[in-house]
């Protein structure tokens, strides 16, 4: 545990003296950039609903480039990308597009060099190109210069033939851009035979590739690549169910390779299920039950249950308890969010999802910080959370369980007529936690109370998290003041996160205090935001 720091000394280089001679956790432009890369906004609020990206969202990023720190910005973009610290890819790709079109030469060069690292799949590359097109007018610059052509050519040339074939046949186009467009505009010269085959396939089609290579002596690699491309073409033209299944099994074709018609076949889905990644499996449980791929007692149900209960698979796919909970609640309802698809939930799968929920707690990495969670227990917490199928009390209970089970030092309290302890222990089930919360008489949600209570009771906490619906009433003391008082009294650089889970917008966080964050709604991205914020990465 870090030693506590006197409030009168800077907590780290990120703190600057304020006029009262105390220390406020100042937000620097680099912090603002980190927030933008993580969730698309430089401010202190995480919104679930999609925010439109424009230059006005990235003022700190532009200031950093103007201050000669553009190469540092590129380094941060690469770090966020490699370490998977972003809730969505768009802000990071937008930032890279800005850097690649700015007037600073070294920033520009570093941005183009980073394209292959940051744009890991074709979808990212297409999105990056579209952002460049969107920015062309406002940044008053050209687009298709030599540097971009080289960056695109390198993106294709750095991949092996087989890897590129997999990528271009799975992710064909996005935002109006296709591989054919990019190859035409970049004047690519393939660096290997494998790449020459794939690029010819993209620009001229399978027929020409087949004609060119049918008489040639082929290496094992080339033969494998041609067979794969042939399978991708064959599957597009066949209506024979058995042939589709054979091609899926032999060449590991995925859903994106198939026609809509193929997906009406139960047997085709059974073939896809064999190699289906866990995230796709969780997404498709309802669909596969609705179309009778999963029927009580069949071998497919056994396979699904086996995958869901495999701790190694859960860890490898980085499945969080929250992901499982969403899948479980969605599956349990027996219909899709828009209500068209309907199914009868399978009992064995429900049991497996329930077991997986508890297994995935082991895959969550502790942060090593001290947490104080304050939960709103009012009846309005039964409302549906923005961005989720879950209600607010279920999200709050699940998050209390995650923290209690993974962090050594945590405390849960509830808003009653005063702050009261809410007993959440590591051996409790979700139902037991919800029951414990429902038995506490509800009081008003005054977001300053957790800090006031912790100060009174001398409870040390690095991070306060308030879980409420949209009641973020501030009492006589503003939460920002209560937090600063707590920091001063306890000598702890504490942070505050307020999750207004059914709220479209509220403002509690002081935008100039780096240790405060508001969250409107709650989704799987919110988990990354909380983790990054706790660990000082944003």
Curated annotation (Swiss-Prot):
GO terms for biological process: cellular response to interferon-alpha; cilium assembly; immune system development; regulation of gene expression; response to UV; smoothened signaling pathway; transcription by RNA polymerase III. A divalent metal cation binds at residues 378, 380, 445. The keyword Phosphoprotein applies. Residues 120-284 are annotated as: RNA-binding. GO terms for cellular component: cilium; cytosol; nuclear body; nucleoplasm; ribonucleoprotein complex. The modification N-acetylmethionine is found at residue 1. Keywords: Acetylation, Cilium biogenesis/degradation, Cytoplasm, Metal-binding, Phosphoprotein, Repeat, Ribonucleoprotein, RNA-binding. It is found in: Cytoplasm. Belongs to the Ro 60 kDa family. The horseshoe-shaped TROVE domain is built with 7 helical HEAT-like repeats, and is closed by the VWFA-like domain giving rise to a ring-shaped monomer. Single-stranded RNA is bound in the positively charged central cavity. RNA-binding protein that binds to misfolded non-coding RNAs, pre-5S rRNA, and several small cytoplasmic RNA molecules known as Y RNAs. Binds to endogenous Alu retroelements which are induced by type I interferon and stimulate porinflammatory cytokine secretion. Regulates the expression of Alu retroelements as well as inflammatory genes. May play roles in cilia formation and/or maintenance. PANTHER family: 60 KDA RIBONUCLEOPROTEIN SSA/RO, RNA-BINDING PROTEIN RO60. Identified in a IGF2BP1-dependent mRNP granule complex containing untranslated mRNAs. Found in a complex with PUF60 and Y5 RNA. Interacts with RAB11FIP5. This is RNA-binding protein RO60. It comes from Homo sapiens. The gene is RO60.
């Amino acid at each position: 545990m870090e030693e506590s720091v006197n409030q009168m000394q800077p907590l780290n280089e990120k703190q600057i003296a304020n006029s009262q001679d105390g220390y406020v956790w100042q937000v620097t432009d680099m912090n603002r950039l980190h927030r933008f890369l993580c969730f698309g906004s430089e401010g202190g609020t995480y919104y679930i609903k999609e925010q439109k990206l424009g230059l006005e969202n990235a003022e700190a990023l532009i200031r950093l480039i103007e201050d000669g720190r553009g190469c540092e910005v590129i380094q941060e973009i690469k770090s966020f990308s490699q370490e998977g610290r972003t809730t969505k890819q768009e802000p990071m790709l937008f930032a890279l597009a800005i850097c690649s079109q700015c007037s600073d030469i070294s920033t520009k060069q570093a941005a183009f060099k980073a394209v292959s690292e940051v744009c890991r799949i074709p979808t990212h590359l297409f999105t990056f190109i579209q952002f460049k097109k969107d920015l062309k007018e406002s940044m008053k610059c050209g687009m298709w210069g030599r540097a971009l052509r080289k960056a695109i050519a390198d993106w294709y040339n750095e991949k092996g033939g087989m890897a590129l074939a997999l990528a271009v046949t799975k992710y064909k186009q996005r935002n109006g851009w296709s591989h054919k467009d990019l190859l035409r505009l970049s004047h690519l010269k393939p660096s290997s035979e494998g790449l020459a085959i794939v690029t010819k396939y993209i620009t001229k089609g399978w027929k020409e590739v087949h004609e060119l290579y049918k008489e040639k002596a082929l290496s094992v690699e080339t033969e494998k690549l041609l067979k794969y491309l042939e399978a991708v073409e064959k599957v597009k033209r066949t209506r024979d169910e058995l042939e589709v299944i054979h091609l899926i099994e032999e060449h590991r074709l995925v859903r994106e390779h198939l026609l809509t018609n193929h997906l009406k076949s139960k047997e085709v889905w059974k073939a896809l299920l064999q190699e289906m990644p866990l995230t796709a499996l969780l997404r498709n449980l309802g669909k596969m039950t609705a179309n009778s791929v999963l029927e009580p007692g069949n071998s497919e149900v056994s396979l699904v249950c086996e995958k869901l209960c495999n701790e190694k698979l859960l860890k490898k796919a980085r499945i969080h308890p929250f992901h499982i909970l969403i899948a479980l609640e969605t599956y349990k309802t027996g219909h899709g969010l828009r209500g068209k698809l309907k199914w009868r939930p399978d009992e064995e799968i429900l049991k497996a999802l329930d077991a997986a929920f508890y297994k995935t707690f082991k895959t969550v990495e502790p942060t090593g910080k001290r947490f104080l969670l304050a939960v709103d227990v009012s009846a309005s917490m039964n409302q549906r959370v923005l961005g989720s199928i879950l209600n607010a009390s279920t999200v709050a209970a699940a998050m209390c369980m995650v923290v209690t089970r993974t962090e050594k030092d945590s405390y849960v309290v509830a808003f009653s007529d005063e702050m009261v302890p809410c007993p959440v222990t590591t051996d409790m089930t979700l139902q037991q936690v919800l029951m414990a919360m429902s038995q506490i008489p509800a009081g008003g949600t005054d977001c300053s109370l957790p800090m006031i209570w912790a100060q009174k009771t001398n409870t040390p906490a690095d991070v306060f998290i308030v879980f409420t619906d949209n009641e973020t009433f501030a009492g006589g003391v503003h939460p920002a003041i209560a937090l600063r008082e707590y920091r001063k009294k306890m000598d702890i650089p504490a942070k505050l996160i307020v999750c207004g889970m059914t709220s479209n917008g509220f403002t509690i966080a002081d935008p100039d205090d780096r240790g405060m964050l508001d969250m409107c709604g709650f989704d799987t991205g919110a988990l990354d935001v909380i983790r990054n914020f706790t660990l000082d990465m944003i």
